[in-house]
Regions:
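Conserved glycine-rich Rossmann-like NAD(P)H-binding loop of the short-chain dehydrogenase/reductase
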Residues: 24-38
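Conserved mid-core segment of classical short-chain dehydrogenase/reductases
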Residues: 56-60, 64, 69, 79-101
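Catalytic loop of short-chain dehydrogenase/reductase
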Residues: 83, 88-94, 99-100, 107-111, ...
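Rossmann-fold cofactor-recognition segment
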Residues: 44-57
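Rossmann-fold scaffold of SDR-type NAD(P)-dependent oxidoreductases
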Residues: 5, 73-83, 104, 128, ...
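C-terminal helical subdomain
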Residues: 160-163, 167-202
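Canonical Rossmann dinucleotide-binding motif of NAD(H)/NADP(H)-dependent dehydrogenases/reductases
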Residues: 1-27
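A glycine-rich helix->loop->beta "capping" turn
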Residues: 47, 65-79, 85, 164, ...
Length: 202
């Protein structure tokens, strides 16, 4: 049972297809691109749920749908995010800071916190997949550092609950899509549940 937080944007489709090819039961969030979400659902037999994760009301509504689909149990949460913002510090105004950085940080925290009760199966896992470009700016570097700290802290907090927490930060300009998706799937497998607190760069 796998939830992917963005199955349409930020390369999310490759994660949906990779897990589906191995018979996983999948749900994915999307905030736009309705037609793409419907088409992907048909191709992968996955449940699509419209959700803007930085909006707490939208997130709680999505969780009600998810609760009925997965019966309050989840094996893997794949938090898919695009951090390839090349905005420099001198070009970062308050609006860009709130929507480009703070909203992403809020989305990570709120989603993982809200889904924590679902991660109650043996060897559950959280995998953060973050896409970045060749030219990382101030916002990208801030988010990358936040992800590194989050993985380290969260893996310690959830270790006694046998929940592994790892991240993959990858260059989205490289042609390695399915390789990245397969790496995320392998990190979520019970066989590699002893691996936690790692940030892998591809």
């Amino acid at each position: 049972r796998v939830l992917i937080t963005d199955g349409v944007n930020a390369g999310g489709e490759m994660f949906v297809r990779s897990f589906a090819s191995y018979g996983a039961s999948i749900a994915f969030f999307y905030s736009n691109s309705y037609d793409k979400a419907i088409a992907l659902s048909k191709d992968s037999s996955a449940l699509n749920i419209r959700c803007k994760i930085s909006n707490i009301d939208s997130l709680w509504s999505a969780l009600e749908v998810l609760r009925g689909y997965f019966d309050d149990e989840l094996d893997t949460l794949v938090f898919n995010i695009d951090i390839s913002d090349n905005t420099l510090f001198d070009d970062m105004d308050g609006d860009k800071w709130r929507h480009g950085v703070i909203a992403e940080i809020d989305g990570l925290f709120y989603t993982i916190r809200a889904l924590r009760p679902f991660l109650n199966r043996k060897n559950s896992s959280i995998v953060v997949t973050a896409a970045k470009g060749k030219n990382s700016g101030f916002a990208c570097d801030i988010l990358e550092s936040y992800i590194e700290g989050l993985i380290k802290s969260l893996s310690k907090s959830l270790d006694t609950a046998n929940i592994s927490v790892n991240a993959i930060i990858y260059d989205k300009d490289k042609d390695a899509g399915m390789h990245i998706a397969d790496a995320a799937r392998q990190l979520s497998s019970g066989e590699l549940s002893v691996i936690t607190g790692q940030v892998i760069r591809l």
